[in-house]
């Protein structure tokens, strides 16, 4: 006797399943996604087309294909997420490339540079194409850089992105060969420098930042040590510590301020710069130099201020000093500004911690 399996109980074959899936996919192609999802929770996954998993090395992009690519950042204002508010700075930070710089004493130097480029974004614009900032900058990257070249790069990406405000900042480590105090040796000192060009409301400002590392001997500790020696015959040594000042200056329009010029100014203000090459005679000289120039953090800020005020090429400026105490478990800090460029009601919470320079 033959037993027939009811059709309802028979499992569909693979061929039948493939045919059913093809029908489902054809239907889904012309059906709103919400209707597909309403059919069954697993339906969207079933009808998703099979995709190639091999990279198409031979594929080339023509103008028609390029025009078809979605561009969300240039979409309508309806795509804006959150408040329709002006963004003061939007762009890219820390893209690196080798850049040649003009110097006062050593011709042109090529240095690894970290670049930050930003523009303002109007309230009704969704976003920017950030790659344009890099492309605009790279168009000038083979030139020896000065503020004039930075200005041309800024003009390019400000125009490309149709923005009213823009900024470029370039950070690098600037090498200078410096002599020891007495032994006649020389060594390379490296200075963290940043160049910044700001265009805001049609007004442009050229700004230079420099981190200067020096030794600060506490005047109070020096006097107390001398008191112990004089009054009690007790040997005592004053405390001193590695200290850092971040000097930021606005270079007046049409003026040229070399990196080395700013270094000369800060060295004249505080002569106890940390040393590179040191023999015993240099170490003794450094002890004598520190004893001759004891300095509180307030003194340091005002000494730098006096030197900067003396140079007619410098407009507004800011001095941020940190004496990283060897006596205390805290640091002594000061901030001095002149002019509106660097004035601020609030300080970056990490401002002073960013002044630590690890050897």
Swiss-Prot record:
Enzyme Commission number(s) of this protein: 3.5.4.16
Keywords annotated in UniProt: Hydrolase
Any single GO BP term: tetrahydrofolate biosynthetic process
Site (May be catalytically important): 218
Pathways per UniProt: Cofactor biosynthesis; 7,8-dihydroneopterin triphosphate biosynthesis; 7,8-dihydroneopterin triphosphate from GTP: step 1/1
Keyword Phosphoprotein belongs to the record: no
Gene Ontology MF terms in the entry: GTP cyclohydrolase I activity
Gene3D superfamilies named in the record: Urate Oxidase
Domain of life: Bacteria
Its job: Converts GTP to 7,8-dihydroneopterin triphosphate.
NCBIfam families found in the cross-reference section: PRK13674.1-1
Name of the protein in its database record: GTP cyclohydrolase FolE2
Species annotation: Cereibacter sphaeroides (strain KD131 / KCTC 12085) (Rhodobacter sphaeroides)
Gene: folE2
């Amino acid at each position: 006797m033959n037993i027939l399996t009811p059709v309802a109980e028979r499992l569909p074959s693979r061929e039948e399943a493939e045919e059913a899936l093809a029908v489902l996919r054809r239907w889904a192609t012309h059906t709103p996604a919400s209707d597909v999802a309403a059919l069954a929770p697993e339906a969207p996954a079933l009808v998703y087309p099979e995709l190639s998993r091999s990279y198409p090395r031979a594929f080339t992009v023509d103008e028609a294909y390029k025009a078809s690519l979605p561009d969300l950042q240039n979409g309508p204002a309806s795509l804006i997420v959150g408040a329709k508010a002006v963004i003061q700075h939007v762009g890219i930070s820390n893209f690196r490339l080798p850049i040649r710089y003009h110097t006062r004493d050593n011709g042109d130097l090529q240095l690894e540079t970290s670049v930050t480029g930003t523009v303002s974004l109007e309230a009704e614009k969704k976003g920017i194409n950030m790659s344009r900032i890099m492309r605009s900058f790279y168009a000038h990257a083979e030139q020896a850089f000065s503020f004039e070249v930075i200005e041309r790069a800024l003009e390019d990406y400000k125009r490309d992105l149709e923005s009213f405000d823009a900024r470029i900042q370039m950070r690098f480590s600037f090498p200078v060969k410096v002599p020891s105090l007495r032994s006649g040796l020389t060594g390379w000192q490296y200075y963290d420098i940043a160049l910044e060009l700001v265009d805001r409301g049609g007004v442009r400002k050229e700004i230079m930042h420099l981190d200067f590392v020096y030794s600060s001997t506490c005047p109070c500790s020096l006097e107390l040590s001398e008191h112990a020696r004089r009054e009690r015959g007790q040997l005592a040594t004053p405390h001193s510590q590695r200290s850092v000042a971040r000097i930021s200056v606005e270079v007046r329009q049409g003026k040229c301020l070399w990196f080395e010029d700013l270094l000369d100014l800060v060295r004249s203000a505080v002569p106890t710069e940390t040393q590179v090459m040191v023999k015993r005679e240099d170490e003794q000289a450094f002890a004598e130099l520190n004893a001759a120039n004891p300095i509180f953090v307030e003194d340091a800020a005002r000494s730098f201020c006096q030197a900067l005020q003396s140079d007619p090429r410098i407009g507004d400026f800011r001095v941020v000093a940190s004496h990283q105490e060897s006596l205390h478990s805290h640091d002594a800090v000061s901030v001095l500004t002149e002019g509106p460029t660097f004035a601020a009601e609030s300080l970056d919470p990490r401002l002073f911690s960013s002044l630590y320079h690890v050897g």
